[in-house]
Amino acid sequence: IGPEVHVMSVCQPTVPVLGAISLMATAGEIAPRSMIMMGGPIDARKSPTAVNNLAMNKSYAWFENNVIYRVPANYPGAGRRVYPGFLQHAGFVAMNPDRHFTSHYDYFLNLIRGDNDDAEAHRRFYDEYNAVLDMDADYYLDTIKLVFQDFGLVKGTWTVQGQPVRPQDIHRTALLTIEGELDDISGAGQTEAAHDLCTGIAAQSRQHFVAEGAGHYGIFSGRRWREQVYPVVRDFIAAHPHGAASARPRKNPAAREAA
């Protein structure tokens, strides 16, 4: 898609995005100008949430035996192993049942009062919140093992087709990480950990931002996204039209001649 690209990843994709750009950098390929990582588990050991604890306290086999199903007959992809969308949805709702109950009760009251604006805002939110997709089983299980159990990226043990994933090889891609102050899915510091891994990017080409009062969804949707987060993303991309400054020390001409 060309070199003039800025990549944004939200939640789970932050890890494969960082992995892909690391491999591109190691291979000497043209990499994106910047990478924006939002609310993702780069280092899931930091400030573990209920999501992290579940993944760490259950075995790989438990997930394979309890949340993986085959698509029924008469549906597209029949027979394919997936982590079903309805289970994902049930899991998210179960994390904050009181909040969802209150939200729906308030929605009912708004309908009675004729408060159409608040009622419509509720419908828009849940139209997105309830939109789930069956996830390929191998992708889901690989994520559980690599990200939440083995911590392969931060420990430096992750390899792709025999090639080690080395974030320290990234030099020309600027890095912006974004976290929500109240995020109960990706805890504080999990996304910011990318800065500790990307040591080849100069400090002036790296930035971390915490959205005050924002939960997980607030950093990429709704008012807090529009008013707090989007301006930061916009300005960061505009400030790095040619990529990042490298943190690698440059040899002076005399040193190059001596070499």
Predicted regions and their residues:
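Conserved alpha/beta-hydrolase "acid-adjacent" motif
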Residues: 184-190, 202
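Catalytic histidine neighborhood in serine/cysteine hydrolases
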Residues: 197-217
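Short beta-strand immediately N-terminal to the catalytic nucleophile in serine-hydrolase-like folds
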Residues: 7-9, 38, 178
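Alpha/beta-hydrolase-fold enzymes
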Residues: 3, 16-138
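Catalytic histidine-centered segment of alpha/beta-hydrolase-like enzymes
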Residues: 211-227, 247
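Gly/Ala-rich beta-loop-alpha elbow adjacent to hydrolase catalytic centers
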Residues: 9-17
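Active-site nucleophile elbow and catalytic-triad environment of alpha/beta-hydrolase enzymes
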Residues: 148-167
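Short beta-strand/loop motif that positions the catalytic acidic residue
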Residues: 170-171, 176-179, 183
